[in-house]
UniProtKB/Swiss-Prot annotation:
Changing C205S: Partially active, with very weak activity toward NAD. Keywords: Cytoplasm, Iron, Metal-binding, NAD, Nucleus, Thiamine biosynthesis, Transferase. It catalyses: [ADP-thiazole synthase]-L-cysteine + glycine + NAD(+) = [ADP-thiazole synthase]-dehydroalanine + ADP-5-ethyl-4-methylthiazole-2-carboxylate + nicotinamide + 3 H2O + 2 H(+). Its EC number is 2.4.2.60. Its cofactor is Fe cation. During the catalytic reaction, a sulfide is transferred from Cys-205 to a reaction intermediate, generating a dehydroalanine residue. HAMAP family: THI4. GO terms for biological process: mitochondrial genome maintenance; thiamine biosynthetic process; thiazole biosynthetic process. The keyword Ribonucleoprotein does not apply. This is Thiamine thiazole synthase. The gene is THI4. It comes from Saccharomyces cerevisiae (strain ATCC 204508 / S288c) (Baker's yeast). Changing D238A: Partially active, with very weak activity toward NAD. InterPro entries: FAD/NAD-bd_sf, Sti35, Thi4_fam. It is found in: Cytoplasm; Nucleus.
Length: 326
């Protein structure tokens, strides 16, 4: 240590954290003072392969017919999944996320900053999730946006009736003949690995897979003894798959029109996105939440304030719960 250094040598016995002596972080778990003979339990490489693939394909089989399909695992999609799956453990909730990492744009606040701002009353959802925040009067601040999205993601994935298929994208919607009212009827989603979808222009035909909504007989006709499943699209407004379902609905049904997202206005945008979230007129069994609603209905964007992202998911989830309760 140089003569000019201000560093102070401190023995381990002097270190304290909250008046509790610091000990080895694994001392109460592994309980090994001498690591020279440390060993993991043995395993074969094929055992790992079978453990992964058997469970994944079992999930594909189980969720091939789902009650709720959520497209997009950002803040609104995950918030909706939490509310639906927690309140209705009997429903199979399938979440499809195009990215390897779920969470959408909620890992950071605005302009890649850390803190997440939520206007009240969105703090009530934070309380439900037991996420700490600083109360600033009309709004609250979560110290890091990742704390919010990682918490809701963790809670959703622990629910037994939820499956997240990440690195998987929705390429199209499954449709049925229009209803008597002339409404387009969605009956499922067409999926593929995201990397395959992005490589369609480089290879010959690489056909997709399908996840169907509950409510149909083996011949494809409606089974009126079952509640029809629903799709909740929360694909945001930017990125390679932004507002995908909204754009696809407009392509399928010429009576529909894409409003196009307007400029930033926090006070109008957050309110409007929450209020407009939910069932979509003219499309049976289709719901929207999050920034995709702004693209669909021509609403303002709100920028780096996240209360509407969570509560639009909650609002859509409540409508979906009413659908299954009716």
């Amino acid at each position: 240590m140089s003569a000019t250094s201000t560093a102070t040598s401190t023995s381990a016995s002097q270190l304290h954290l909250n008046s509790t002596p610091v000990t080895h972080c694994l001392s109460d778990i592994v309980k090994k003072e001498d690591w020279s003979d440390f060993k993991f339990a043995p395993i074969r490489e094929s055992t790992v392969s079978r453990a992964m693939t058997s469970r994944y394909f079992k999930d594909l089989d189980k969720f091939a017919v789902s009650d709720v399909i959520i497209v997009g695992a950002g803040s609104s999609g995950l918030s909706a999944a939490y509310v639906i799956a927690k309140n209705r453990p009997d429903l199979k909730v399938c979440i499809i996320e195009s990215s390897v990492a779920p969470g959408g744009g909620s890992w950071l606040g605005g302009q890649l900053f850390s803190a997440m701002v939520m206007r009240k009353p969105a703090h009530l959802f934070l309380q439900e999730l037991e996420i700490p925040y600083e109360d600033e009067g009309d709004y609250v601040v979560v110290k890091h946006a990742a704390l919010f999205i990682s918490t809701v993601l963790s809670k959703v994935l622990q629910l037994p009736n939820v499956k997240l298929f990440n690195a998987t994208c929705v390429e199209d919607l499954v449709t049925r003949p229009p209803t008597e009212k002339g409404e387009v009827t969605v009956a499922g989603v067409v999926t593929n690995w995201t990397l395959v979808t992005q490589a369609h222009g480089t290879q010959c035909c690489m056909d997709p897979n399908v996840i169907e909504l509950a409510g149909y007989k083996n011949d494809g006709t409606r089974d009126l003894s079952q509640k029809h499943g629903v799709i909740l699209s929360t694909t945001g407004h930017d990125g390679p798959f932004g507002a995908f379902c909204a754009k696809r609905i407009v392509d399928i049904d010429q009576n529909q029109k894409l409003g196009g997202m307007k400029g930033l206005d926090m006070n109008h945008a957050e309110h409007d996105v929450v209020i407009h979230s939910g069932a979509y007129a003219g499309v049976d069994n289709m719901y929207f939440a999050g920034m995709e609603v702004a693209e669909l209905d021509g609403l303002n964007r709100m920028g780096p304030t996240f209360g509407a992202m969570a509560l639009s998911g909650v609002h859509a989830a409540e409508q979906i719960l009413k659908h299954f309760a009716a």
